[in-house]
Amino acid sequence: MSGPAAVIAVTSLSLEARIALGPGVSVICGRASHIVSRLQAAIERGTLGIISFGVAGGLAPDLATGDCVIGSGVHTEYERYPADRRWSRRLLESIPGSVHAEIAGVDAPIAQSSEKVRLHACTGAKAVDMESHIAARIAARHDIPFAICRTIIDPAVRDLPPAAVIDLRDDGTPDVPAILHSVMHERNQIPALVRIAIDAWTARNALLRDRQLLGAGLGCPYFDERASEPVRVGVFATTQLRPTGP
């Protein structure tokens, strides 16, 4: 934690964490199942805001690899958590060409393009990830400002092969033995993995550029003002949604 009032960035990949880390920013990294306890512990040390930062899958057909999405909020199946408007506006102003849109929060990877089309149609979300809804839920519980900054890695038309959706290790690094095992058993996924590797490189460069544009505190306006005036934030609302199925 960089001081008692740093911004907390929530990521899954260790690569995302390395990019996010900087002045005024601490990082929670790892599998979604471990984020809750780690984020709760970090909040106890004090924070001015929580941001979901990293890569995301594309749901809208007009988004390409490397495009930046600033979340207006995140949907789960039954709930919607809005992002802090002031922070989101700062992010949009800082990153040229960024898109302001809803994010879908899921608990399992969305691997097939047909699933992406369905999720986009059902929710209107333009991107999907597995961390934003977890971070948003905890931020809402503690009335902490929340934001989303995500870069598209796999566009809506891209199917992900089995090796690409294997769970990460606890520290946010790829489980290389499991990936190799998958490839050895299904060698026909190699061309798709090569395409994904190219997408990942493009997304990584875009994410690094966006991070540099945001500067200290990842664009959090409350971080900028902490030395000159008290932080005042409103109640973080949660909207209950009806189930889409029976």
Regions found by a protein language model. Give the residues of each.
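Glycine-rich phosphate- or other oxyanion-binding loops that anchor nucleotides, phosphorylated ligands
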Residues: 3-246
